[in-house]
């Protein structure tokens, strides 16, 4: 699942021919990684990671988390935990035990589904705008002139460089992934 369709991309760029469809599809497919870097997974995917805790919570690294599939001990003699005995806060990716006990007997291999399932309209619009920005690097502005808009980014954005215009980041802000847990 891409963040936008070829037809949506062509509408955004005012392209009516099929001459650039192959190249445009490559641009479309390249949009997911930089946007997910800012907001976390959009397309649902299975994630397996190793976690350890001696506290009351485990924190998944990919959020939002849709469902928990399994949690199994990594080490021989580790404590197995039944998924039904856990509560998942999908938005934050935090797991805790229903009985209130601390996690012990780890580390564990945790498998879960992360993502949003569908592309929210605001993220779709952000993807369209990012596509338009990236397309300009090769083909120039298709609509009107002017380098005064924020597509001509002149200041690097920490962690993103020059690739994502401010207007795209502002659209993604409502979906921004929470900071990592150390």
Tell where the protein language model's regions lie, with residue ranges.
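Divalent metal-cofactor coordination and adjacent catalytic microenvironments
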Residues: 1-182
